[in-house]
């Protein structure tokens, strides 16, 4: 029992841990294990020098995603944080999204965006919706807004197609996202709703707003009814603010109200419902007799709107005829509409023939002269254009009287006349207008061909301006081309009949069996076949639907015929009937599908439809079934309504109703409860742009908010709707409208034209509308009086905060009547007279943030918490300013500026941040830092920021002293300085003496001799010493006397004037000779390409290529050198040559023989080599282990062969390696020992990308795999206008990765001296330690001189004025002939001295 209890307890603990893990999901932050290092062997620390603002250990996978790639367009010594040559105030920066773990302060960048994020809202613990002016998200083309799922990193697009504009604002309401802006969607404007669960976007029920409208803000007022069910609590109203004056469904704004006044003249537009359907003649065959026009013109007149005409030959009768397509033959038309041309010519008498019965049709029509029904057959009259329009004009004058007949409808605007001529069903009507007359067919005759014969004409020829046929049945063909409208321009109309093949392949029966004539239909043999037919049922009423099935005898398919399932679906997707139909009928047949009521549908998204799908075959075992689809016919039995009516402002129809409009100007209240059972048919009945307003049209209320909207001018614009917290009584709530306002009403006046402050009294749950107190006072002045404060400019944005709100923008706020009534948050709430750009309003008091005015329109705000500190971030036009709201002060350190526009906390442990740059780097320091015991610290070097500086080189001298160099400045030091290793935090010391550096001079290499007496500096430009000596190439500094030596080497240069470089120096201790390598070819006047030896003892340059018994020549650029024997140096570089032989990667120089050679095994490396490290102390034969890096490679040498070890490095155009070292592990490891011992690990520094990890500046290699170690950051800043005062935000920045140029350690493997191989005691002599320590600590040359006065004579008695005692010249040297070049060189030296 106890065991079972223990097992159960362990299970519960596991479940609890699992739940906690889910709650604090750190799956995004996978830790990276770092090896433990022994810092004692590296001088107790690892120095990192370069170009950066901050550093972090690479603690988790993708740690460095918060930094961007470096800007390769900027020079390595032109810092990205110093790109300040732009004065633009609209500089655009890319934005990013960051996931931050609040608990561990980890940050992960998971998205790059090519624009600004303006809104960011949490949808769930795993998803957010973001909106802004971006079109690309992680290089994926998108339309804003989008939904981003964090765990899967998937983007859900709300809009998949172009919306011809942009979404300016979004509002999240549970499962719905309201979208507002200036866009077009689904033929509606400026508003839409996205359902998060269904993943579908829809038009709003009110069909958005009018063309050229714009929605800038959306908010919600809850109904506040505590007694309603929980699911009803979220109703209330949605408020839309922007610039608009109508709704997309504008009839919602017209109320049909009862009126006692029945004598006012009715100016309504009336329209009879035309339920009859236009028969498509588009694919008919057109012929004519005695036609003057072409057959093309004969076909074109079936689309009268194209303004084409068909003319008979002059002074001659003629015939125009159309033969229907085979599948349409036998149709029963109900009327023809004949269009009359303008001008003197036209048809006076005509007759209509029908085929195949070849008979003259009996016709009935409305005689325009009497407006009575008339009949004709062989001699039917048409009026000419002028006479017809006289009658139409007369109708306009007598419209009121004519419309008293309920079966007659006269349009009061254009005088068109219609009446029903089937009083029982009222499904057919007849009429005329200014350019046509209609003629109904008395007999119900099936026709294959219809012809119009011209008997008499007006003028000198008969002309047809158009011809249309109608029927009172709705026929949908399976062959969708037969559903095409007569006019191509109507092809996209939602009211067209159409057929959609859902699955399967359908063909014309005539294409399968050409012998079949006089009929055509679709055939398929696919067993998954399905087709849907959409009849144009535009009006609600009773319909009878039948389906026609062709007989199998026509095509001989009886044995193969199929069984089909036919389903009738209503416009609300309800299944109305289902039929199983056997298709093996020999002759044509029809089946009843449905009889009953159908709702009229106006769009393809809510249409009645008939679905036909394959079920099986009548005969079992048939392998090639034969499913046929011909047509479906919906016959109109009766309609619910028979007329439409539309009216303008305050007019009356004949039944005593008045149409009262609701006026909108930039503000609209959308009641969710009112629209919960919305049906557009309860708004109006619409046909041919003529509208009748329903008495039930009460969806949009004339609420006090809509009333306020109507009383604003039509130039008003609302930029923001802001709702304050509810007041103590629980009902009243503040409503702030920000924008540009004027009032057109005498009933409402405004105290300013920027902000309207309202109070929501309550929400009326009966009328489903918001009750507000309307403003009623006018004060117009240049300044804006808002809540007791005077603003000299408009507020751009309001931000709701708990118990208060913020106003931000390009303004200055002063106290009422200039008083000091404003409190300064940055100065213990002391009274001040003004606030600039940002102001907080709380408890009837305005507060300032203590900043000076900045000429910038701040329009973005976000607040977030970092390291338990709340920050406010204000931004606009690329400028950011960060306020520490816990300590009430501005953040002035640029490295701590939060360039964020949005923040959203998604759970207790994580938040999403959006902006141009964000950093939670672990350690802030400019260009220098060191690691000791696994933590960052920094040297006593205060490099001046915002300059193009970089520390590029370093040299560890001994336990007391290190030297750094580059191109940098501190308060007292320039380009080179001395660091105390015993106290690294102590202030850096400068070199003593007068020194003037050239503008572009850079310390490229450093070396201190084995006796720690001389500091050799390799420089690429001029240096003036002690106001008289100009040096380029090598500068020598006396560390003992703390002064520049009085002897300095002749300058290094290029004979063609090109810049030089001094990349490496090594010292041959025995001969006291310094070997210098780089890119140059002259030392003074001495030819000395690539390599030159400086004889320290004799203070002269020697060309090593001419110093041997046999002259040798070398070429290329030397980049690195190291001793491998006490008298031999291994040299590498770019494009090295020896005696004209190219392709050499490594050279060997022997100081004893003054000769050059190569070792074949080393030169088998395929890549270029810039630097290398010898990883074995005993490597006399160069068969030890090595590692080398080049521009695009890192390779290891096992003593015999080279092998690439950089498979995990991704090479890009910015990839750069700068330095490498061997570090010591805290404990021996089981690492691969191919390239170094198991107690060591290799590190390389620069800037590069590691596979699976991302950007790094420093990585470790354990012999098998790479481990990211350190990455840095650097703010890229650009000027964006002037700013002053505390917290000045005149610069916008983006976080990029920095550079590590040099690793400073006590390096046992640098081998820059032949004595380095001896592993001698490197400690300074007692006198030197005391002297240098005091010099570094105190910087006092006077004290240094006093301390050295005694040991100087004892220890350095052979030195005078910095010179070594010259060695005796041997007799054999005196016997050699003097080289003229050397003689000239000696003359140069004496001249310089």
UniProtKB/Swiss-Prot annotation:
Keywords: Cell cycle, Cell division, Cell membrane, Glycoprotein, Membrane, Signal, Transmembrane, Transmembrane helix
Glycosylation site list: 62, 85, 105, 125, 133, 139, 164, 186, 195, 212, 256, 260, 266, 269, 362, 398, 405, 479, 536, 542, 565, 599, 646, 649, 653, 674, 689, 696, 702, 714, 747, 764, 768, 792, 829, 863, 899, 935, 946, 958, 985, 1020, 1030, 1041, 1213, 1232, 1262, 1323
Protein localization: Cell membrane; Cell tip
Keyword Signal: yes
Extracellular compartment segments: 22-1329
Gene Ontology CC entries for this record: cell surface; cellular bud neck; cellular bud scar; hyphal tip; plasma membrane; plasma membrane of growing cell tip
Membrane topology: Single-pass type I membrane protein
Main localization, broad class: membrane
Disulfide pattern: none
GO BP: cellular bud site selection; hyphal growth
Segments traversing the membrane: 1330-1350
Ranges in a coiled coil: none
Phenotype reported upon loss of the gene: Leads to randomly positioned branch sites and reduced bipolar positioning of secondary hyphae.
Signal sequence annotation: 1-21
Cytoplasmic side: 1351-1393
Record-linked Pfam families: Rax2, Rax2_2, Rax2_3
Protein task: Required for establishing sites of emergence of yeast and hyphal daughters and for maintaining the linearity of hyphal growth, but not involved in responses that require a reorientation of the direction of already established hyphal growth (tropisms). Does not play a role in penetration or injury of human epithelial cells.
Family statement: Belongs to the RAX2 family.
Name of the protein described by the UniProt record: Polarized growth protein RAX2
Lineage of source species: Eukaryota, Fungi, Dikarya, Ascomycota, Saccharomycotina
């Amino acid at each position: 029992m106890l065991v079972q209890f223990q097992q159960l307890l362990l299970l519960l603990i596991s479940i609890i841990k699992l739940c906690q893990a889910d709650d604090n999901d750190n799956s995004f932050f996978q830790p990276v294990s770092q090896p433990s290092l022994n810092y004692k062997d590296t001088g107790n620390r690892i120095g990192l020098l370069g170009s950066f603002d901050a550093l972090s250990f690479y603690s988790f996978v993708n740690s460095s995603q918060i930094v961007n790639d470096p800007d390769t367009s900027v020079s390595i010594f032109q810092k990205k944080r110093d790109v300040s040559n732009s004065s633009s105030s609209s500089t655009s920066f890319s934005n990013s999204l960051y996931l931050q773990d609040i608990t561990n302060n980890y940050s992960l960048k998971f998205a790059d965006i090519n624009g600004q994020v303006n809104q960011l809202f949490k949808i769930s613990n795993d998803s957010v919706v973001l909106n802004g002016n971006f079109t690309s998200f992680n290089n994926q083309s998108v339309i804003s807004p989008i939904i981003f799922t964090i765990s899967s990193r998937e983007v859900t697009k709300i809009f998949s197609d172009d919306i011809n504009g942009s979404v300016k604002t979004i509002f999240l309401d549970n499962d719905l996202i309201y979208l507002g802006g200036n866009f077009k969607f689904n033929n509606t404007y400026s508003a839409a709703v996205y359902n998060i669960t269904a993943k579908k976007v829809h038009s709003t029920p009110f069909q958005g707003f009018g063309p050229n409208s714009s929605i800038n803000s959306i908010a919600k007022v809850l109904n506040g009814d505590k007694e309603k069910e929980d699911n009803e609590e979220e109703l209330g109203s949605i408020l839309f603010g922007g610039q608009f004056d109508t709704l997309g469904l504008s009839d919602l704004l017209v109320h049909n109200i009862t009126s006692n006044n029945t004598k006012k003249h009715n100016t309504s537009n009336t329209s009879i419902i035309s339920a009859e359907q236009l028969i498509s003649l588009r694919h008919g065959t057109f012929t004519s007799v005695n036609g003057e026009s072409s057959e093309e013109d004969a076909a074109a007149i079936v689309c009268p709107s194209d303004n084409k005409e068909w003319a008979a030959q002059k002074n001659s009768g003629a015939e125009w005829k159309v033969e229907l397509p085979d599948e349409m033959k036998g149709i029963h038309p109900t009327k023809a509409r004949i269009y009359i041309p303008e001008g003197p010519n036209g048809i006076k008498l005509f007759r209509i023939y029908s085929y195949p019965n070849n008979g003259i049709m009996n016709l009935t029509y409305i005689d325009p002269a009497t407006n009575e029904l008339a009949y004709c057959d062989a001699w039917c009259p048409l009026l000419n254009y002028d006479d017809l329009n006289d009658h139409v004009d007369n109708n306009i004058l007598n419209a009121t009287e004519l419309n008293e007949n309920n079966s007659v409808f006269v349009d009061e605007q254009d005088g068109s006349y219609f009446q029903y001529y089937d009083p029982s069903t009222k499904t057919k009507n007849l009429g005329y207008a200014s350019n046509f007359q209609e003629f109904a067919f008395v007999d119900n005759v099936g026709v294959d061909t219809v012809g119009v014969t011209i008997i008499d004409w007006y003028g000198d020829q008969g002309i047809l301006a158009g011809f249309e046929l109608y029927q009172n049945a709705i026929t949908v063909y399976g062959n969708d081309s037969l559903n095409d409208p007569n006019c191509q321009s109507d092809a996209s109309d939602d009211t067209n009949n159409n057929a959609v093949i859902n699955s399967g392949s359908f063909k014309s029966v005539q294409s399968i069996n050409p012998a079949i004539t006089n009929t055509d239909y679709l055939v398929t043999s696919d067993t998954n076949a399905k087709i849907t037919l959409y009849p144009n049922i535009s009006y609600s009423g009773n319909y009878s639907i039948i389906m026609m099935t062709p007989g199998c005898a026509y095509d001989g398919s009886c044995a193969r015929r199929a069984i089909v399932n036919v389903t009738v679906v209503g416009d609300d997707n309800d299944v109305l009937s289902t039929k199983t139909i056997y298709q093996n009928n020999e002759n044509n047949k029809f089946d009843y599908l449905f009889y009953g009521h159908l709702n009229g549908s106006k769009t393809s998204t809510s249409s009645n439809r008939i679905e036909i799908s394959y079920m099986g075959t009548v005969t079992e075992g048939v392998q090639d079934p034969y499913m046929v689809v011909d047509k479906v016919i919906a016959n109109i039995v009766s309609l619910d309504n028979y007329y439409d009516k539309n009216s303008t402002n305050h007019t009356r129809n004949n039944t005593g109703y008045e149409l009262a409009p609701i006026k909108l100007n930039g503000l609209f209240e959308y009641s969710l409860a009112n629209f919960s059972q919305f049906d557009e048919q309860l708004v109006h009945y619409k046909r041919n742009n003529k509208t009748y307003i329903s008495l039930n049209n009460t969806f949009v209320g004339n609420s006090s908010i809509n009333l306020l909207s109507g009383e604003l001018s039509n130039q008003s614009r609302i930029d923001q709707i802001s709702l304050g917290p509810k007041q103590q009584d629980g009902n009243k709530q503040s409503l702030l409208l920000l924008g540009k306002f004027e009032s057109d009403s005498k009933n409402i006046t405004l105290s300013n034209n920027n902000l309207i402050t309202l109070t929501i009294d309550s929400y009326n749950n009966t009328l489903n509308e918001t009750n507000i107190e309307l403003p009623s006072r006018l004060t117009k002045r240049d300044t804006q009086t808002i809540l007791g404060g005077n603003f000299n400019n408009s507020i751009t944005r309001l931000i709701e905060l708990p118990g208060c709100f913020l106003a931000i923008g390009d303004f200055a706020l002063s106290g009422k009547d200039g008083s000091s009534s404003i409190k300064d948050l940055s100065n213990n709430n002391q009274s001040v007279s003004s606030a600039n750009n940002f102001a907080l309003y709380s408890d009837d008091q305005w507060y300032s943030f203590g900043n000076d005015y900045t000429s910038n329109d701040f329009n973005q705000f976000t607040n977030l918490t970092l390291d338990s500190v709340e920050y406010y971030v204000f931004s606009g036009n690329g400028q950011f300013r960060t306020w520490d709201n816990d300590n009430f002060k501005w953040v002035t350190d640029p490295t701590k500026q939060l360039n964020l526009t949005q923040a959203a906390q998604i759970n207790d442990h994580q938040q999403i941040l959006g902006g141009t740059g964000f950093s939670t780097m672990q350690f802030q320091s400019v260009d220098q830092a060191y690691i000791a015991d696994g933590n960052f610290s920094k040297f006593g070097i205060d490099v001046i920021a915002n300059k193009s500086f970089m520390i590029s080189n370093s040299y560890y001298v001994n336990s007391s002293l290190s030297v750094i160099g580059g191109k940098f400045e501190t308060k007292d030091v320039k380009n080179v300085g001395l660091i105390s290793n015993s106290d690294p935090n102590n202030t850096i010391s400068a070199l003593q003496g007068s020194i003037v550096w050239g503008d572009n001079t850079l310390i490229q290499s450093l070396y201190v001799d084995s006796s720690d007496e001389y500091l050799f500096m390799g420089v690429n430009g001029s240096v003036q010493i002690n106001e008289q000596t100009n040096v380029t190439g090598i500068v020598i500094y006396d560390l003992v006397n703390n002064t520049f030596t009085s002897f300095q080497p002749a300058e290094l240069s290029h004979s063609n004037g090109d810049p030089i470089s001094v990349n490496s120096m090594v010292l041959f201790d025995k001969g006291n000779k310094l070997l210098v390598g780089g890119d140059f070819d002259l030392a003074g006047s001495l030819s000395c390409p690539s390599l030159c030896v400086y004889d320290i003892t004799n203070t002269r340059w020697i060309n090593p290529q001419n110093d041997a018994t046999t002259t040798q020549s070398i070429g290329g650029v030397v980049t690195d050198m190291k001793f491998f024997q006490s008298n031999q140096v291994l040299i590498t570089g770019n494009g090295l040559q020896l005696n004209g032989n190219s392709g050499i990667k490594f050279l060997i120089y022997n100081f004893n023989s003054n000769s050059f050679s190569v070792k074949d095994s080393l030169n088998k490396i395929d890549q270029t080599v810039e630097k290398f490290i010898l990883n074995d102390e005993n490597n006399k034969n160069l068969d030890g282990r090595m590692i080398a890096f080049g521009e695009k490679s890192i390779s290891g040498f096992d003593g015999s062969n080279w092998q690439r070890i950089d498979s995990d490095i991704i090479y890009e155009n910015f990839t750069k390696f700068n330095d490498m070292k061997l570090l010591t592990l805290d404990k021996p490891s089981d690492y691969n020992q191919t390239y170094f011992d198991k107690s060591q690990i290799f590190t390389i520094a620069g800037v590069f990308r590691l596979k699976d990890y991302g950007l790094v500046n420093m990585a470790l290699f354990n012999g098998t795999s790479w481990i990211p170690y350190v990455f840095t950051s650097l703010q890229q800043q650009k000027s964006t206008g002037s700013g002053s005062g505390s917290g000045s935000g005149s610069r916008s920045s983006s976080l990029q990765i920095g550079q590590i140029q040099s690793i400073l350690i006590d390096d046992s493997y640098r081998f820059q001296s032949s004595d380095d191989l001896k592993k001698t005691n490197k400690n300074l002599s007692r006198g030197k330690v005391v002297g240098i320590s005091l010099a570094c600590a105190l910087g006092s040359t006077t004290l240094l001189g006093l301390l050295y006065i005694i040991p100087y004579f004892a220890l350095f008695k052979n030195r005078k004025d910095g010179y070594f005692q010259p060695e005796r010249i041997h007799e054999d040297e005196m016997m050699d002939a003097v080289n003229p070049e050397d003689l000239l060189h000696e003359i140069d030296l004496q001249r310089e001295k």
